[in-house]
Amino acid sequence: MVSTGEVRKGLTLIIDGELFRVMEANHVKQGRGTAFLRLTLRNVRTSATTVKTFMAGERFEVARLSTRNVQYLYREDNYIYVMNTETYDQFPVSVDLLEDALLYIRENETFDVLTYEDEVLDISLPPSVEMVVVETEPNYKGDTASGGGKPATTDTGLVVQVPSFVAVGERIRVDTTNGKYITRI
């Protein structure tokens, strides 16, 4: 349990049975009246943002979140099945939770998931990943007048703008935060 004075940005609290991540915490002390805490909260499950006000001295329960390293096994319908790399337990993760992250992970790769009481809340991708180019326009000798890139489709289905010298079958490194080409490997 934490009091209003200990609440900071980044904490995950349980309020009215729901999990909320503190996006912003403003401690307000007025000249007259009691101090209060105004929180901008994001519901961890629904991503809805709300602003709530609490009186000074109120206490909150902190959610005990854990990070687990998992391996992507396979996809079936609207779920991917992953395996905890420490306990070898297998469990499904909703594709809706992963959104665009599926474009950066392949079968048998590992990544971290954030869990609360065995419920997967979020995933954490590495800063960059290696991918193989499976489709792109051919490179023509002397075709550098435009100076721009060309679209390339990777083995996961992600379309990335790459320099004109990148060919089909080559390995590239892609930034997972913005989906941009970093380098050829």
Swiss-Prot record:
Coiled coil: none
Pfam families noted in UniProt: EFP, EFP_N, Elong-fact-P_C
Example of a GO MF term: translation elongation factor activity
Localization, UniProt: Cytoplasm
Transmembrane segments annotated in the record for this chain: none
Signal peptide boundaries: none
Superkingdom of this protein's organism: Bacteria
SUPFAM superfamilies in UniProt: Nucleic acid-binding proteins, Translation proteins SH3-like domain
Biological process (GO), any one: peptide biosynthetic process
Principal localisation: cytoplasm
Pathway annotation: Protein biosynthesis; polypeptide chain elongation
Keywords: Cytoplasm, Elongation factor, Protein biosynthesis
A cellular component annotation (GO) from this entry: cytoplasm
HAMAP family, A to Z: EF_P
Record-stated family: Belongs to the elongation factor P family.
Function of the molecule: Involved in peptide bond synthesis. Stimulates efficient translation and peptide-bond synthesis on native or reconstituted 70S ribosomes in vitro. Probably functions indirectly by altering the affinity of the ribosome for aminoacyl-tRNA, thus increasing their reactivity as acceptors for peptidyl transferase.
Protein name per UniProt: Elongation factor P
Species annotation: Herpetosiphon aurantiacus (strain ATCC 23779 / DSM 785 / 114-95)
Gene designation: efp
